[in-house]
Amino acid sequence: MKHPLEFIPLNLRKPLFYVFFAMTIAIFGIFNILDQPLRTDSAPNGIVSFELARKVESAQSIADSWDANARLFAAFGLGFDYLFMPTYALALSFGLLIAVGNKKNRYAVFATWMGWGVFAAAIFDALENYMLWCVLTDDIISPYPEIAAICATIKFILLILGLVTALSGRFFSN
C-alpha cells in the first residue's frame, strides 16, 4: 500500500509539512480562544466535553450551561473545524511520510497505514461535528450525542496513534 501523499515530490514534502504544521498550530490557537466561553462546570474541557458527552442528559447539561454567546462560539467552532480537518490531516500525514523516509520495515507499513488513518480521523471529525450541530440546534435526542462521542473517540485514537507513530520514526531503522 502506498502512502496517500507519496505522489508529492520529495523536495516539496518538508516545505508542505511546515506550511500545514504552522497552519495547524495557528488554527489550534484560534480554537483555544474560541473554547474559553465553553468552559463551564458542566463542560470543564469546553468543546471536548461536549464531543465526549455520550449521553443525551450530559449533552443537554452542557448545552444548558452555555449562554447565547457561548453557543455562538460553539457553532462557529464547529464550522471552523471543517477548515482545521484537512489542515491537521495533511500536516500529520506529511509528518508520517517524512518519518517513513526510505524505511522498508514494519514501522514503514504501520506509518503508511496511519497516513491514511489521519484522513479517516478527519472524516470521523466531520461526522462528529454534524452530530454536535444537531445537538446544538436543540435536537438533543438519541443517537446524536452517542454517535458524536463514538466518532470523537475514534478520531482522537487515530490522531494520537498517528502522532506517536510520526514522532517515534527516528527510533526505527531499516
What does each model-identified segment do?
Residues K2-F76:
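Interfacial loop at the N-terminal end of multi-pass membrane proteins
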Residues P4-L12, S65-A68, L72-A75, N102-T112, ...:
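Juxtamembrane loop-transmembrane helix junctions in multi-pass integral membrane proteins
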Residues V19-A26, L83-L90, W113, G117-L127, ...:
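Lipid-exposed faces of alpha-helical membrane segments in multi-pass integral membrane proteins
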Residues I27-F28, N32, A63-W66, F76, ...:
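Multi-pass alpha-helical transmembrane bundle typical of ion/small-solute transporters
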Residues N32-Q36, S93-G101, A126-N129, T165-F172:
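Short hydrophobic alpha-helical membrane-anchoring segments
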Residues F76-A99:
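Hydrophobic alpha-helical transmembrane segments
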Residues L97-T137:
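Hydrophobic alpha-helical transmembrane segments of integral membrane proteins
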Residues A121-R170:
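Alpha-helical transmembrane segments of multi-pass integral membrane proteins
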